[in-house]
Structure formats: C-alpha cells, structure tokens
Amino acid sequence: MKLTRRNAVSGALALALLTSTTAMAQLATPRTLDELKAEIQARADRKAYPVSQLDAAEVREVLANLKSQDRDHWASVWGAIGDRHLAKAKALEATDKAQAAHTYDTAMQWYMFARFPLEDSAGTAQAYQKALDAFAGYSRNVDPPIEAVKFNYNGTEIVGYLRKPKGVAKPPVVITIGGLDGRKEDGSIRNAAYLAKGVAFFAFDMPGTGQTRIKIEPGADKVYSVVLDALAKRDDVDGKRVVVTGGSWGGHWSAHLAYSEKDRLLGAVVPGGPVHNYFQPEWQKKALGTREYLFGLFEARAAVYGVKTLDDFLAYGPKMSLKDRGFLEKPSAPMLLVNGRNDTQVPIDDLQLLLNNGDPKEAWVNPQGGHMGRTAQLTDQKIFETVVLPWVVRRLGASM
C-alpha cells in the first residue's frame, strides 16, 4: 500500500533506559549446524537472501562438506566453489569477455557468502579479498566497465565503484549504500538496471563494513558528504542530480542524508532503515534472536560499533537515534520509505516515525512482508524493479 501522511504535532522524545543485560543467554538459541544447513538449502531452492545468487545444486554440494560452523572452515568450503568459477573466468577472459564477466560475478557471489555475514577470521578475510579480486575481473570485462574511485576521508582510504551508462554525456547519479552484511560489490551487480534508464551509479560500503573502515558513530555521515563533493567535481556525471538509496542498515544513512544533505539530494530511498526504535535495548534484546536472519546477527551488529559485549552493544545504539538527535522535525529531501509490516530485524515503527514527522513522504509497505518488505514470493529483486527503481528514475528526471 502507498501512503502519504503529514503530522503537524511532534512526538515527545523517548529516552531508552538500559536494563540489566549481562549474558547472551537472554537471546534466542542460534540454529544448530543441521538446522542451519536445512535453512540454507531451503533459501537456495527458492532463491532467497542471502543465497539468492547461488546455484542450489552447488549449495547442496557444499553443505555435504560443511562439518562445523568454525569460521575458517566455513570460508574454506564455500570458497572452494568460488575457486572453481574463478578458474573458469580466467580461462574465458581472452576469448569471451561477456561470459568471463558473468563467471567472475558467479565466483564473487560464492566468495561473498564465504565471508558472510562479516570478516571475523583469517579465512573469512581471505574470502573477502578473493571476492574483491573476482569483482575486479568482472569490472574490467563488463561493458560499460566499472571504475574504482578512491578518496581520502580523515586519513582513511575509501573505495567506491562508479559505472556510467553509454551515450549519456552527464548522467544523473544514484548513490547506493551497502547494508550490514552486504557489500558494494553485491549491489553493483543489481545496480546495472539503472544504466538502461540513463542513470549512473556510485556503490559504496556503509561505515564499519567492507572498504569503508570507519566506525559507526554520530558524525560518520560526513563520509557521504565527501562522496557528494567528489561527484560534484566530476565533469562526466551530473553531481546536481543525485538520489541516495541504502538497504537495511544502509537505509539509516539514506534517511540521515535526506536531512543533513537535503539541498544536494533529489531524493532518498529508505528500505528497512533503522531510525529510533531499532537502537533501543528492548528492541535489540528481542530482535537479535530473530530467525529471519540466517546466523551471526549479534556479531555483525556489534562489529560495526566496534564493541564486543552485549552490554556495550546495547549501551552504544541509542546515540545513533535520528529522533533523539533532533532530525525528524527538520526539512528533508523527498523520501520513499519501504518495509514489511512483519519485519523482525528493524521495527516497522521506525518507518512510521519518519512518515508521521517532518515533511510529507511516500511509503510502500507490504502487509505480509518481512525485512525490507520481502516474502518468499516477493523477492528483493522484484521490489527493487517495481518499487525502488521507478521512483529513483522519476526523481532524477531520467528516461523510463
């Protein structure tokens, strides 16, 4: 359903009280190895996140060899299939660049799952590096090619990917922000759909993930200001026609930028983005046990804050609330809010907070949907193609 709502009365600020939470035993028990294997295969069979891009028969092959959840063992058995496809890609590169690009992409997808949901061991870090190498192979063989753009942010090198449509002198740009466990390389494959609409994309890891090695904290949004500065200085894209979109945790940054960079954005898409309630201890104590997430949710969420313990994690989150930081009543760039009513990772109440405060906004809510609106039948890709992509193109004034 599509909603547009205006609420002239600001809500009272709700200050979260940190309760006594000292043991991970408070959280739901993680899946056993057998349960995890069964869930992975079920998701692969129906092409569901995070294995939607993996061949179901090859997934079955890997699962037969998966003996434990040890992170290095995990990286090794999944990465072995990536190695197989990488060898094929290298052999194809001299004779069939298009097929080589496709096969490099396939290899990258396996390496990405070998490091999922984060790089927290030697093996998973190696898998991520292999994913970067495979993506580099994809980038140089795909047409049009992908440019790796590097810039400095407070002494830290940040890397993003720019890809431009053919035949468009100064195309508008969509900045796509990775989420908690996804990476800019994943997004760059789906982002190819923008090219057919005359839109360039700049793909970028959110703070605390991938190659954006800065901690999530108030003020980390300034890294996106540097990206906007860099795009504005280029003569091959239109830095005055920019929309930003970020999935899940990346949606937090989309919403933030809709306020902090409203004068430089034509719009912001917020699919399942954390706003306020997500950051509260009571929500996290419930959400960290969700079976909607495959495994390792606490580890992935804690890592982007740079903390290790549950107590430190719960204490850290509230400082990121857009409500408590006074953003919600400020003017904003136009927003498209996307989520499912049954999201167990980010509360639907966060979408309502954005919708009910500040400037008018648009929203697409799936009454049966989980995180970011997805269901078994309505995939992330379908939502992207039918909801997000058309809205972004309209905001940019590009051709449909």
Residue ranges and their predicted role:
Residues 214-237:
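Alpha/beta-hydrolase active-site loop
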Residues 259-315, 333:
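Hydrolase active-site cap/lid region
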Residues 331-332, 337-339:
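Short beta-strand/loop motif that positions the catalytic acidic residue
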Residues 170-179:
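Short beta-strand element of the alpha/beta-hydrolase
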Residues 236-248:
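Alpha/beta-hydrolase fold nucleophile elbow
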Residues 344-350:
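Conserved alpha/beta-hydrolase "acid-adjacent" motif
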Residues 369-382:
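Catalytic histidine-centered segment of alpha/beta-hydrolase-like enzymes
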Residues 77-78, 82, 120-122, 126-167:
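N-terminal cap/lid segment of alpha/beta-hydrolase-fold proteins
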